Amino acid sequence: MGSSMATGNRLKPRAPFTRALFLTVFCLVLFIYTLRPSSIERPAQVQPQRNPMLNGSHVHMSDCTINKSQLEDLQDRYELGDEIEFARRYVRFHRQDIDRKPMTKIDMDLFPRGFDEIDIRNPPRRTTCLKPLEVPVPRSRTPNTVDASDLLFGISTTYSRLTDEEISPIKEWAHWLTDGNGKSNGAGLVLRLIDATVEELEETQAKMTDMGIDVKVYPTDSSIEMAKRYLSLLPALYNDTSRESRKFLVMCDDDTFYPSMHNLLDRLSQYDYRTDLYIGTLSEDVNNIQRHGSQAFGGAGVFFSIPLAEKVADKFDQCSTAEKIEEANTGWGPQGDILLRKCIHEHTETTLTLLRELHQLDIQGDPAGFYEGGLSPLSLHHFKGGMWHKARPYEGAQVIHACGEDCFLQRFQTADDFIISNGFSIAYYPKGIDFNIHQIEKTFTAAPDDYGWNLDFMLGPQRKNLLWTGRKVAWELMEAQVQKDGSVKQTYIRKTDDYRWTYGEGGNRMFEKDGVLELVWISS
Ligand SMILES: *[C@@H]1O[C@H](CO)[C@@H](O)[C@H](O)[C@H]1NC(C)=O
Ligand SMILES: *[C@@H]1O[C@H](CO)[C@@H](O)[C@H](O)[C@H]1NC(C)=O
Ligand SMILES: *[C@@H]1O[C@H](CO)[C@@H](O)[C@H](O)[C@H]1NC(C)=O
């Protein structure tokens, strides 16, 4: 039944306490613990749990078995040590007529029995078996009911990026272009592949069509100046035969991700698509706005109404002369976003309509503060590492297939000082949650110059980060699977050598072993 508290591993980071103090606290905790109503399943009840609300097809089992080969696979993928700390918790969500709160407090412990100490070479057959954690969630919709036929997207990229195992965006595109079951959600995609061969175009077309993506793949030519190529995508979208049935033409980067299409469409429906509209967002970094101008930063997604797209298409030649391209160079090479803004400003009365839930994410370093901020982003960008940050929003967003769009990045605070940022992390605060949860933790930096306040206008002033303080440790989501019964299993991992979880910068590690936490989201 896993390790009990007697092994002293109950959520205990290695702290420089004296043994006496430790024992006193330990005995106190043990005493209080015996008085609490237990959320632990008695061994006799370690059986499939039947929820009377469910009919036969949706019975969820609390599976407390440990599968050695699955642990070995995780060990391989994430270079885990042989001895790990492990815990699994089922989370039963209850859809209610409530708003999505910045923080949902749950009056239960997340891991009342701490973690099991497991040797992957010889694991126990079962893990500590707990009753599901019960959490309320708003009634939000799932991808299988999206009708996005109002939208036609345009992206330029290269065949080599599409086929790169590390950064290929195709499965992410399928998230926002299909119903999650291999069928188009109605949205179209015009994909331009730079310098691709006929075979590459055909292969891409076939592969993406197979995945249910309504795509038209075209070649484009690297000899055309990049900024001009970018601008020419809008007339190409405007020219598409499906235009008549669209309301918005959307340009974005190959690393733009739209987690929640219902929410995106709801927001867009607040605007009158028959008027001239240029909708997008600024960079979070005022430094970039000063450098490049007040315009839509394309990685967050830029939405054009058809009437405005028509005007840009008409003026394409005038807007893309050598002189205009030179004017779009702010010292970082000619920028497509600038060429587009100038074309709109110089030929129409339209300026940017700011949709702040879109995110360019010009941030570097540890992005946790953003993803743990309780936000409900309509787009995400720059999350593939390299010079920007690294995150896994595709894996994170899988949970919406079970509990609806609002669940992604929704926060739950449990009685034992954990905060689940659903689909990003499970963070534990050993000294309590004594900070302003409404502010974003400044774990990241602006680039290339961080004045300390560049990001404040868009993200709000951020609170001081808790790195190297011993006050925070987080397991981050690495994978997630929608399972046959409709539940979603998430795997969160904390490595012992993570540079962030130490006492003092470069100081002693808070934990001696790697940690794996699993959450399984089941419906009520
Ligand atoms: C069982 O539940 C599923 C999903 O809620 C529903 O589609 C199905 O009709 C239900 N079957 C019965 C027998 O109630
Ligand atoms: C354990 O997991 C593997 C996949 O890693 C799977 O093939 C196997 O069926 C699982 N075994 C049991 C008993 O569930
Ligand atoms: C759009 O169609 C017009 C008319 O058929 C054509 O002249 C123009 O080159 C096309 N533009 C693009 C970018 O495909």
Protein language model features and the residues they cover:
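Conserved catalytic core of nucleotide-sugar-dependent glycosyltransferases
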Residues: 15, 256-347, 355-364, 373-375, ...
